[in-house]
Amino acid sequence: MSLPNAFVTLLTTSSYLPGALVLLHALHDLHPAPRDFQIVALVTPETVDAATIGELRRAGYDLVIGVEPIGSGKAGQVGLELMGRPDLNFALTKLHLFRLAPFFSTLIYLDADILPLRPISHLFTSTAPHVFSACPDTGWPDCFNSGFMVIRPRESDWDGLKGMLKDGEGEDGLYREAGNGSFDGADQGLLNEWFSEDGGGGDWNRLSFTYNVTPSAAYTWAPAYKRFGHKISNVHFIGPNKPWTSLPGRPAGVSNVKGKENSYDYLSLIDRWFAVYDKHVRPASALDPDISRRFAVPQTIAAWDSHANQARAAATVLPEDKLDLSELKAATERGVNAFKPGQYTSLPLEGRVDLIMPKPKAIPRAPISQLVASSTIAPSVSPSALTPPPADAAPAPAPAPVPTQTEQKTAQPSVWDAQRSSPPASAPPEMSVPHAYYHNAWEAPLSQQSSYYAHPESHRPATEHKEPEYPTLPKEVTGDSWYARFATSTPDKRAISAVFPWEEKSYGPGYGHGSRPKPERVFPKGEEPLPSLVQQLIHPLQPPSISIQNPTPPHPAHSQHQSHATGMGMAGQAPKSPSPPPRHVSMVEAMASYKNVWDDIPQIGRYVDIMSGKTGGKSVRGVSTRGHGHGHGHIQGHGQGQKQPQAQTHERNTSLHSLQSVPGTPRTQYSTFGKSPRLTNARNLERRESFEQPEDSADGDDENSTSASEEEGGKSREGNSSKPYKGNKKYKDRWAQTDRVKTVDETVQTQTHAGEEAAAGGLKMWGLPHASAHGRKSSKEIPFPIGSGNGRAGGGGQREAQTQHQSTYYEYQQQHPHSQQSRQGSMASPKPELNVRLPDYSFDFKGATSHAQGLAQAQAQAHGQPQGQGANPNLNAQHRHRPSGSFSTIYGGRGRVWDPNTDVEVRRRDSQEVLARFMQGSLGRG
């Protein structure tokens, strides 16, 4: 019984599925039933998914055969890259066609990218008796193109092709020129080598080019295509661009050919391929969509209403792949060549049952421990002989005598591969991985943290840590003179050159030439106990000692009394009581025991307090009872360290003497330039009286601010208010200070009576003489009450000041009615409101010299004015405070009168004198 014929195609990737389906339906259209041939597809399950194989079976392929992929390998990559088609790396799988000799007599092979245009089944008989027939290639016509072939398979051809693949590798393991036996790296070069005049398969039979037309943009002969185009039987779409690559962007039934047909009709051939695809492969809904069905409302049928569906589901339906009993009997009668339509079978190589390519066999590698052992043991000794047998094992038989002539086998050196296995347990120390877990020390309680810092010899077991055994250098290295300086265990100190000049000198007892002193500084080792400060944090803290220090050395009797009162001090400490049991303390308690080293030196503490302007946390002007000279004057302990009244008075007087020596800038209340001493002394007396009133500013840093302890000793101060602390040589007049803030109102000026004073807590605004030659307004002293930071000047004091201001202001208006007129015209000025924010007053020190130059002229004009012009004889022009800014135009454009006592140089000189007195006072007390 003769074997059937078959059309065969190959599918090594799922991307060629549209081409294989179009090829199947084109053959069906060109060869209607009944057909005397089969259509077979070779697939590689390793590279093609199961869904693609299922589509081929459902589409109508008579048989789907699974085969193993044959790759070009690294040797064939050179030819594929030269051809520019690296995607053809599995093209050698086409050689499985010659293994189909037991199943088919004649094969017509077509690539999946070929479109048949005319019937070609007559080639099954017309090509006889040739074994191999093909069409010439357009690139090299002396060679055939393997995309279309007529083959009568033979087992000898399969064996010869396998031999050529193996012969491509030389004896030295390197591939010759072409690589794997194919000059292009793929199947076409290998087949042209075998089916040639010099090949083992004989010369190939040439078919007409019309059976394998390869249109491309690189090569075409338009006149020949126009003359013989109607005779084309197959169109082969070679190249990387296939017709189905434009499937996502090409709708069904659309043609790319527009207008007149081109001489190169490549687009019309593409349209013919899509015509077959749209007819058989593309879904029917895309060709003729049913709008009513697409937008119909779905209906749900109840399960109890579908009796027919239940009956159909109950019926036993055999799978398509499973044959019933009758088909199995028929298959046994017809033989193994009878297959059911759409059947799938496999054709593994070399008798294997798995089509997956086998992995390369790994060379057995000996463990590293055996390699290390083999380096010191003779090769003839077996490793198993070195392993002692178990105690209960039977005695081994005596080994056979070793022949005199033994074969010495060289073991393959093995190297550990980190990508495949973990490090061996018996590896050298440089390859061993430590398996240890370390806990965070800061997460443990304080009682356990001390164990981490203990000496290792007392707490660490001796067997816990073992130094690894490092390999030694081979004898060949140590005995070689070339490695002599590197193979010695101890380095030669003579080879070390000195870096610094003093390193050339050796240690000696003296400092003479050629010797240098031996260093006395010793650095602690790494495992030494921690410093005492760190141990205080680790171990339970003991209660801190109570100590009080005075800023100045007190009287001997007072020192003894204080030492007796405190019980414990820096000079003499009482015997300590037994410490309480250890307890866990917090970080705040641990940090409370710290103190600065310089806190024990009272001279440094007093100097810091004086330079910072504070004593015990208060202002320099205030008096504090805190006697600790370095700022830590709070008494620790329970009721200890309380001073006696006599000691407090003595310390307070000492602090007052040291604080009252702090003067300010020497400045009087009024300018004394050109004034009589009588008027100056009178105003100085008024200034003294105003300073006796306690007034504090809002920032608490006023020169008159006092503390609560100063008010307790107020009686002694009131008795000697006119001459305070005359016994102190460093004391300077307290009221010779910078004036308080004064302001001048725009319309209301201060009065001309020098003897009147403003109410307590108010600001005095000084103006200019009334009815001067330049039309200035009369001056009137207006009390302006303000509130202090501590509220002393507020409340009733402010209301009293406001009442006095109103009465004084109205009397002044009745006596001087003409002062209501404005400088610009007859517009009446409104009554000033005291709650209006006054502008800032500034003083230009750079312009003080120019103002001082016109001082003499200002005095002459003020004294030379007649009495009938309304000049004020009690106040001169140089004594008036002139505001800056927009107020300079109100007072005739004159600048502020310069006072010699407010000069910058005078203030700088006085500040230097004050600093010198402070330094002398602090050093004298220290």
Swiss-Prot record:
Residues reported in the UniProt entry to bind UDP: 10, 12, 16, 85, 111-113, 236, 239, 242
Q: Which InterPro entries match?
A: Glyco_trans_8 (IPR002495), GNT1/Glycosyltrans_8 (IPR050587), Nucleotide-diphossugar_trans (IPR029044)
Residues bound to UDP-alpha-D-glucose are: 10, 12, 16, 85, 94, 111-113, 145-146, 184, 187-188, 239, 242
Q: Where is the composition biased (Basic and acidic residues)?
A: 456-469, 733-745
A GO BP annotation: glycogen biosynthetic process
Q: Where does Mn(2+) bind?
A: 111, 113, 236
| Residues carrying sugar | 219
Gly residues bias locations = 788-798
The UniProt keyword set, sorted, is: Cytoplasm, Glycogen biosynthesis, Glycoprotein, Manganese, Metal-binding, Transferase, Vacuole
Cofactors demanded by this protein: Mn(2+)
What is the first-listed, main subcellular location in coarse terms? cytoplasm
**Biased composition annotated in UniProt, kind: Polar residues:** 404-413, 655-683, 800-812
> Which EC number(s) does the record attach to this protein?
2.4.1.186
Q: What happens when the gene is disrupted?
A: Leads to the absence of alpha-1,4-glucan from the cell wall, a decrease in intracellular glycogen at 37 degrees Celsius and abolishes assembly of glycogen rosettes. Leads to a decreased fungal burden in the mouse lung following intranasal inoculation. Simultaneous knockout of GOE1 exacerbates the glycogen synthesis and virulence defect. Does not affect survival in macrophage-like cells.
- Tell me which family the UniProt entry assigns to this protein: Belongs to the glycosyltransferase 8 family. Glycogenin subfamily.
Q: Could you tell me what this protein is called? A: Glycogenin
User: Top-down, what is the taxonomic lineage of the species of origin?
Assistant: Eukaryota, Fungi, Dikarya, Basidiomycota, Agaricomycotina
